[in-house]
Amino acid sequence: MKKRTIALLTTLALATGMVAGCGSSNTAATDTAKTSETVSSEKTEATETVESTEVDDQAAADHVAELIDAIYVQTRNDDTDAQCAEAKEAWDALTDAQKELVSGENADPDYFGRDTGDASKDDPLNEDNIGENELLVVSFGTSFNDSRAEDIGGIEKALEAAYPDWSVRRAFTAQIIINHVQARDDEKIDNVDQALERAVDNGVKNLVVQPTHLMHGAEYDELVETLDNYKDKFETVTVAEPMLGEVGSDATVVNEDKAKVAEAITAEAVKTAGYDSLDAAKEDGTAFVFMGHGTSHSAKVATARWQHR
């Protein structure tokens, strides 16, 4: 009887252990499944978060691209100032990663992001209090700050020194440049109409317009046409020749201005190349090639004349 009792107890103990073992195994399996589901859910949420962030980043960049495209080649109007400011504010709000995503018909990260020098070194010469005599320097313009201050600004300063009794002011013919500089650097440069209106409002009597254009091309023609609309607003209006002077009757005619420019740039090229003279460069087998922007305008004949020179 005692042996049967011991055997029965042993059987019960083993059965209990087996049941307990099965229960532990089932619990572990359930816990593992729950953990896997949690990890999978977290991965899905993380992926969705990344994708959502990427969409948000691109949307922010696309918005800035739209604002840049709106002002890029825009003719100045009543909304230009506000739109330039809005585009810059939106750009400044982007992260560095978002800025790299900016892309539009004309827009890219360089529109606001490219370093072209210190804009504060450039004087837009758009002040009032002009007086009766104004010398208006008209250039196509450049959005490169250092070049604008040194090259265009250098010409303007030289004219100020040469004609102290005249007020020197600036105008650009390229609205695309004006908009870019204003949006990026908050520097406002007059276009030709703005500059002429400023002259009228300030009571200018004698106006001399000095273009920095190279030749009698489309920009020069448009400048002259614009001036015709204001000729009765001043007592005298004088328009200076572009750097290469008047257009001759044919490609063999080389006027004095073209000859001087040809000699000047050749001398500078020889000096930059380290030669004492053009003959020395020739003896050394060195040739100089001068490249121009080119134009479909009839003024392209100037290039042929230089070749004759």
Set out the residue ranges of the language-model regions:
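Post-signal peptide N-terminal segment of mature Sec-exported envelope proteins
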Residues: 30-56
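Beta-rich interaction/scaffold domains
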Residues: 51-115
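Residue-level recognition of short, structured coil/turn motifs
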Residues: 19, 96, 164-165
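Extended amphipathic ligand-handling, pore-lining, and cofactor/metal-binding catalytic surfaces
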Residues: 108-309
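Bacterial lipoprotein signal-peptidase II cleavage site
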Residues: 20-32
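Bacterial Sec-dependent N-terminal signal peptides
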Residues: 1-9
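Hydrophobic core
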Residues: 10-18
